[in-house]
């Protein structure tokens, strides 16, 4: 059975935030400290990112997206995505499949996201384009 996927409007965020925040924090744990859950909340509430949830009886997936208009191309970026149950890769695959039609309606020509290398198996249609290299400094 396919679960429901919904892109929430900003006035709906507070109704589901307590269920979504712990899921999103799982993704934040792998984001190298660039932002925290309060930053994510404000980016969504201020309209910079959209919050998507997948649910049946409860929320099983939460993710954020943003449409970015570059000078030559419009893309959908997925900054954060996580499932309540770490085994929910089927939900992740389903979310991408369901979002694709909406993305095209918005004029996006591509979808991009950062992921661990193992996700390549889940998304064989995506091309591995770059390797992110990072060096932390003592401050």
Protein language model annotation of sequence segments:
Residues 1-35:
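Short amphipathic alpha-helix that is part of the acyltransferase structural core
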Residues 1-13, 114-139:
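Terminal substrate-recognition subdomain of acyl/acetyltransferases
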Residues 9-12, 23, 69-72, 89-93:
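Short hydrophobic/aromatic-rich motifs at helix boundaries and adjacent loops
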């Amino acid at each position: 059975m396919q679960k429901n996927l919904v892109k929430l409007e900003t006035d709906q965020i507070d109704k589901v935030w307590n269920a979504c925040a712990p899921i999103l924090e799982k993704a934040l744990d792998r984001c190298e400290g660039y932002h925290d859950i309060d930053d994510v909340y404000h980016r969504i509430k201020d309209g910079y990112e959209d919050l998507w949830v997948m649910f049946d009886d409860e929320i099983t997936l939460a993710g954020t997206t943003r449409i970015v208009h570059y000078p030559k191309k419009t893309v959908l970026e997925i900054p954060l995505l996580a499932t309540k149950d770490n085994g929910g890769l089927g939900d992740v695959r389903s979310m991408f499949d369901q979002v694709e039609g909406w993305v095209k309606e918005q004029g996006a020509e591509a979808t991009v996201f950062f992921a661990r290398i193992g996700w390549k198996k889940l998304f064989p249609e995506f091309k591995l384009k770059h390797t992110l290299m990072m060096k932390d400094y003592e401050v």
